[in-house]
């Protein structure tokens, strides 16, 4: 595997992790707000 390909794969992995954390935080906050608003 070439270093550039490895860097590309790692960037994809880190991007997926960041998106997952953001999505999880948004879902968590929306769930908590829905409970509090009721």
From Swiss-Prot:
Q: What is this protein called?
A: Photosystem II reaction center protein X 2
Which Gene3D superfamilies did the record assign? Single helix bin
The alphabetical list of record keywords is:
Membrane, Photosynthesis, Photosystem II, Thylakoid, Transmembrane, Transmembrane helix
Q: What Gene Ontology cellular component terms go with this record? A: photosystem II; plasma membrane-derived thylakoid membrane
How is it placed in the membrane, per its record?
Answer: Single-pass membrane protein
Q: Say what the protein does.
A: Involved in the binding and/or turnover of quinones at the Q(B) site of photosystem II (PSII). PSII is a light-driven water plastoquinone oxidoreductase, using light energy to abstract electrons from H(2)O, generating a proton gradient subsequently used for ATP formation.
The membrane-spanning stretches of this chain are 8-28
Query: What family is this?
Result: Belongs to the PsbX family. Type 1 subfamily.
Quaternary state and partners of this protein?
PSII is composed of 1 copy each of membrane proteins PsbA, PsbB, PsbC, PsbD, PsbE, PsbF, PsbH, PsbI, PsbJ, PsbK, PsbL, PsbM, PsbT, PsbX, PsbY, PsbZ, Psb30/Ycf12, peripheral proteins PsbO, CyanoQ (PsbQ), PsbU, PsbV and a large number of cofactors. It forms dimeric complexes.
Species, as recorded: Synechococcus sp. (strain JA-3-3Ab)
Q: In the UniProt record, what gene is named as encoding this protein?
A: psbX2
Matches recorded under InterPro entries: PSII_PsbX (IPR009518), PSII_PsbX_type_1_subfam (IPR023431)
In which compartments does the protein localize? Cellular thylakoid membrane
Name a biological process GO annotation.
Answer: photosynthesis
